[in-house]
Regions:
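Long, contiguous binding/interaction regions
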Residues: 1-44, 50-83
Length: 83
């Protein structure tokens, strides 16, 4: 079966986000009332797996092996069956 994966990787609280800070500052300079901005990466993948649980497990492995740095990143995984 095919599964659609959406993985969002973002910095853990307490880690500096220079790109987010710059974005917030520039938006304020443009007149927007932005207090904070956080930059994250989003991955959209199509994966073949035997079950939704297997797809979730493989997505976790991908995050731990490549997509996220466990020292500084948190991630959210959404798995849906492709129709």
């Amino acid at each position: 079966m095919k599964y659609s994966l959406r993985i969002e990787v973002r910095l853990k609280p307490g880690h500096s986000d220079p790109e987010g800070e710059t974005t917030a500052r520039l938006l304020r300079e443009l007149g927007y009332s932005v207090e904070t901005a956080n930059v994250s990466k989003a991955y959209s993948l199509i994966l073949r797996a035997g079950s939704k649980k297997e797809a979730e497990t493989k997505a976790e492995e991908m995050c731990n092996r490549l997509l996220a740095n466990p020292t500084k990143d948190n991630y959210v995984i959404i798995v849906e069956e492709e129709k």
